[in-house]
């Protein structure tokens, strides 16, 4: 895809993310794999004012193009692309329910078969590290190898998939599951979960399930 077209899709994803309630203000960030690196949202610019020329290219060694400042979380995005070469888009948000669960350092267990959208039988929560730090990038790298969506303790949520559209869908499903987990009382006591055997069946069925385009 041409750079300008991909940059436009990144911006439209950001705006849809905020409009749907998955994020607030400029706290989240979005990227897409691009030849030799990635395109990522810039630091501190409102999505309503963002234009394609503001989207920043960062090469696969972590060097941003001259004159532009990428999101403060560019390290976690780059770590994701290195960890999952088959996936092409990353969305990080401070979605309220996902963040609430993450503050308690809870993973989301198999409370509903839709947990399988993550590619595994739970949605993990990685330990807290300072935002923008190499330690956080390392934690995200380990977590994303296990699951396509994850929670970040005292921070937020991250999702990764093959396209921006699928990644936004995955982020939305993760937030819904976090909401269900809270409403089931999962922050304060054990909740019923599906068996490992059932989740194995569901995961197999999910190989052909989900957003098709």
Curated annotation (Swiss-Prot):
Disruption phenotype: Inactivation of the gene precludes growth of the strain with 5-deoxyribose. Transmembrane segments: none annotated. The keyword Disulfide bond does not apply. Binds 1 cobalt ion per subunit. Can also use Mn(2+). Its EC number is 4.1.2.62. Keywords: Amino-acid biosynthesis, Cobalt, Lyase, Metal-binding, Methionine biosynthesis. Pfam families: Aldolase_II. It catalyses: 5-(methylsulfanyl)-D-ribulose 1-phosphate = 2-(methylsulfanyl)acetaldehyde + dihydroxyacetone phosphate; 5-deoxy-D-ribulose 1-phosphate = dihydroxyacetone phosphate + acetaldehyde. Co(2+) binds at residues 73, 92, 94, 155. The record marks 113, 131, 209 as: Plays a key role in the stabilization of the transition state and positioning the aldehyde component. It comes from the Bacteria. InterPro entries: Aldolase_class_II_sugar_metab, Aldolase_II/adducin_N, Aldolase_II/adducin_N_sf. The active site is at 73 (proton donor/acceptor). Uses 5-methylthioribulose-1-phosphate to yield 2-(methylthio)acetaldehyde and dihydroxyacetone phosphate. Can also use 5-deoxyribulose 1-phosphate to yield acetaldehyde and dihydroxyacetone phosphate. Part of a bifunctional DHAP-shunt salvage pathway for SAM by-products. PANTHER family: 3-OXO-TETRONATE 4-PHOSPHATE DECARBOXYLASE-RELATED, FUCULOSE PHOSPHATE ALDOLASE. Belongs to the aldolase class II family. This is 5-methylthioribulose-1-phosphate/5-deoxyribulose-1-phosphate aldolase. It comes from Escherichia coli O45:K1 (strain S88 / ExPEC). The lineage of its organism: Bacteria, Pseudomonadati, Pseudomonadota, Gammaproteobacteria, Enterobacterales.
């Amino acid at each position: 895809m041409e750079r300008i077209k991909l940059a436009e899709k990144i911006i439209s994803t950001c705006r849809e993310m905020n409009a749907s309630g998955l994020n607030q203000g400029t706290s989240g960030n979005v990227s897409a794999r691009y030849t030799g690196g990635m395109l990522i949202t810039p630091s501190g610019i409102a999505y309503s004012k963002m234009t394609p020329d503001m989207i920043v290219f960062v090469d696969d060694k972590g060097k941003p193009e001259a004159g532009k400042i990428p999101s403060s979380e560019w390290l976690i995005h780059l770590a994701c692309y290195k960890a999952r070469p088959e996936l092409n888009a990353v969305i990080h948000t401070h979605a309220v329910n996902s963040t609430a669960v993450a503050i308690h350092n809870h993973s989301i267990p198999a409370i509903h078969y839709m947990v399988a959208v993550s590619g595994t039988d739970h949605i993990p929560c990685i330990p807290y590290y300072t935002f923008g730090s190499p330690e956080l990038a390392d934690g995200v790298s380990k977590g994303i190898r296990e699951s396509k969506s994850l929670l970040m303790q005292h921070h937020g949520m991250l999702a990764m998939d093959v396209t921006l559209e699928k990644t936004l869908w995955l982020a939305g499903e993760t937030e819904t599951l976090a909401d269900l987990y809270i409403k089931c009382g999962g922050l304060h006591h054990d909740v019923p979960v599906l068996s490992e055997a059932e989740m194995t069946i569901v995961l197999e069925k999910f190989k052909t399930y989900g957003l098709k385009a």
